[in-house]
């Protein structure tokens, strides 16, 4: 199985050459300014990709997932959106989480220490593929 991982495309996803693979993973900052319109274009782009499965998590620029979560999730029809949640595909257990330590005033920021640790403590021990926008400490 071939996993293809991309990140930080900032609405420039149509400008990159994506390698072939079985599962396409976008690990956040998929949007430029975080609008639903940008997200709709991203979902259309996901539909055009040949990968059997697509997985998406939000990053600190992906405001619509934080500010308009129901609307944002409804727009994603061609990928699995993970936010502190699991997904099992073809025998692999994935976990996706968008949280990063506070950095200026971006989306999905939590204070270092117990606040962010509480999110990362949710990650199951049997996770095969961990998808985060920033690396969790100690993993």
Q: What does each model-found stretch correspond to?
A:
Residues 21-23, 56, 92-139:
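Active-site-proximal loop/helix segment associated with metal-binding centers of metalloenzymes
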